[in-house]
A protein has these predicted regions:
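Gly/Ala-rich phosphate-binding loop of Rossmann-like dinucleotide-binding domains
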Residues: 34
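Extreme N-terminal starter segment of soluble prokaryotic enzymes
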Residues: 15-19
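Class I SAM-dependent methyltransferase "Motif I" SAM/SAH-binding loop
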Residues: 21-27
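Short alpha-helix immediately C-terminal to the canonical SAM-binding loop
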Residues: 49-52
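Conserved SAM-binding motif I beta-strand of class I
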Residues: 40-45
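Conserved SAM-binding strand-loop segment of SAM-dependent methyltransferases
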Residues: 59-66
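Class I S-adenosyl-L-methionine
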Residues: 9-14, 69-78, 85-237
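Catalytic phosphate/metal-binding cores of nucleic-acid and nucleotide-processing enzymes, i.e., regions
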Residues: 144, 232, 244, 249, ...
Length: 259
């Protein structure tokens, strides 16, 4: 059995946290929050197909469409979001965080300033580390947020594919209080030590690609079936809900230690 199975689901609730999701896709972060008994009060997703899925799975969640038109959606303890990575990833043009798509970080940052959540959870391509991550960290620091980050592969959680993503958890030092933060007991390390992952650190895993030649015809997506194209795009861009669940459990564990 994989060490990650069943993490944190049986932990006692102290105070129920609330979650809001930006660039929601098909709800990977929402599912991860749900695994930890954290309700998602609102989400924001511009693509019609993805919003249809979100409405089916989370019918009670307030839904917004365009983040550029979103303003003060209501307080939540955690805001999550994977702003578009097309300008950042290896497959993109490498324009970085100032590109037309990945530049939507500015909108996410605006919502963070307006809402002032206790925690922020960010997902993106690992290439962000060399294509604008310092901008993200500086912006968060200017409004009082400390941050930690890790590159995590799906394979670490027992999935048969690599898909490494960068995850960053930031926390508001004004709400938490700097005197309560013990840097030797950080969000990630307190959890990773308990699972004995490479001495308390996530590591890159070796191995071949999940995709094989058998999938080549299917992945071309040239059959003209619109639903399948949208479905593949949504799945390809989705946050792994198991990884998301682990990250939310890290936040809950950290928050409980501050009580």
């Amino acid at each position: 059995m994989n060490d990650y199975q069943g993490f944190a689901y049986n932990k006692k609730e102290r105070n129920q946290m609330r979650h809001g999701s930006l660039f929601s896709g098909i709800g990977g972060f929402e599912l991860g929050a749900q695994m930890n008994n954290i309700p998602t009060l609102w989400n924001c997703e511009i693509e019609d197909f993805q919003r249809t899925i979100l409405k089916q799975v989370f019918p009670d969640t307030k839904q917004y469409e365009d983040i550029k038109e979103l303003s003060k959606p209501g307080y939540v303890d955690i805001i999550s979001g994977g702003f578009p990575c097309q300008d950042i990833s290896i497959a993109g043009k490498g324009e970085g965080i100032t590109g037309s798509r990945s530049g939507l970080w500015n909108e996410m940052f605006r919502i963070i300033r307006e809402v002032r959540p206790k925690y922020v959870l960010i997902e993106n391509s690992p290439m962000l580390l060399i294509r604008g991550f310092e901008r993200v960290l500086c912006d968060l620091s200017q409004i009082g947020y400390n941050a930690e980050w890790k590159c995590i592969q799906n394979k670490v959680f027992g999935f048969p594919h690599n898909r490494e993503r960068l995850y960053c958890i930031a926390y508001d030092s004004h709400q938490i209080g700097r005197e309560k933060i013990h840097y030797e007991d950080t969000i990630f390390n307190s959890e990773s030590r308990s699972f004995e992952i490479q001495g308390g650190k996530f590591s890159r895993m070796s191995g071949g690609s999940f995709w094989s030649e058998d999938y080549s015809e299917f992945l071309r997506m040239d059959d003209g079936i619109s639903y399948n194209v949208h479905r593949l795009e949504a799945i390809g861009n989705a946050v792994n809900p198991v990884v998301a669940g682990f990250l939310f459990s890290c936040i809950k564990e950290f928050d409980n230690q501050l009580a």
